[in-house]
Amino acid sequence: MESWKVIMVVTPRGTFEVFYKGEGSPLCVSHLYSVFNSTGDYFADCFTGLYQVFLVNLREAGASEAAHEPFQLRMLESVLDLEAIREELGLPTWAFAGHSTGGMLGLVYGLAAPPFIESTGDY
């Protein structure tokens, strides 16, 4: 079984720890505050057969950037961080999947940056 690879993505908004695995169209998976590591995530693993999955540790999670101000932990700020990561990875768009608060983050992301979110059509 293929293991998750890790990269540190340096953006104008900070540096973020990102794990990736799989092939296909890009799919971002995140949780607002949980920490992911090289063992991946059961939820994210479900998508790696069809997508190149990017498992993102947001601020204050794992080796990602710390929050320097309390407002940086807001969902809209997290969307801006995700957009900076997507741009730095050179991806014109990606799909998004989240569970728990990551699901709520996905709703905010879809409202705030609709041109950059693709539908997986898997529902």
Describe each region flagged by the PLM.
Residues P92-Y123:
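Conserved hydrolase catalytic core segment
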Residues V10-A66:
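Conserved HGGG/HGGXW glycine-rich cap/lid loop of the alpha/beta-hydrolase fold
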Residues F54, L58-A97, T101:
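Active-site loop/oxyanion-hole signature of alpha/beta-hydrolase fold enzymes
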Residues C46, A84-E88, V108:
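Residue-level signal for well-ordered alpha-helical scaffold segments within enzymatic catalytic domains
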Residues Y42, L80-D81, L105:
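Short Gly/charged-rich anion-binding patches and loops
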Residues M1-I7:
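A domain-start/cap signature at the N-terminus of enzymes
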Residues L50, E88-L89, A112:
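Alpha-helical structural context
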